[in-house]
Amino acid sequence: MATSIMNQLLNLWAAIEIIVPIDHSCGRDKIVQITDTIGVMLTLKYGSKIFSDLYKSMKLWDKHTLNHFISKVPVEYGNDLERFIAFVVLSEYEPDRKDLYNLLNDFPLLRYRIYSINKKFSTPKSIHDTMSNHMRKLSWHIRRIYRTRNSMVHNLSDALF
């Protein structure tokens, strides 16, 4: 099983090196270029994934109640997901969110997710901070994968010679 995990990690890194274009003439390390490219790609989708996952969780909790609160947001905001996002982040819906929080007393994790996402995405500064924090964590994970891959490759080459 350990060999399988090692192979998966090596294959993942090989795929990353193939997919991400590396500019050898720019003077930046390969890992920096890979981290920057992948980090930006994954960070661009982060916000939509957060809201989409919360929306799905709310639909599973109580679709009719969710629709009741979404209906308070004008249709000009867009589709149901976009109206849900407006409901979660805009200050004008704070009284309605408090009503929703009361209905979620038996579901504290779901209630906290809404509260937390509201705090992370309600102002330009909080959005910037949230996205920057996500990008930094992605960078750490990518570098961790890179270090592990290098360790495996070097340990394997030491064992062979």
Where do the language-model regions lie?
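Amphipathic, oligomerization/interface secondary-structure segments
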Residues: 1-161
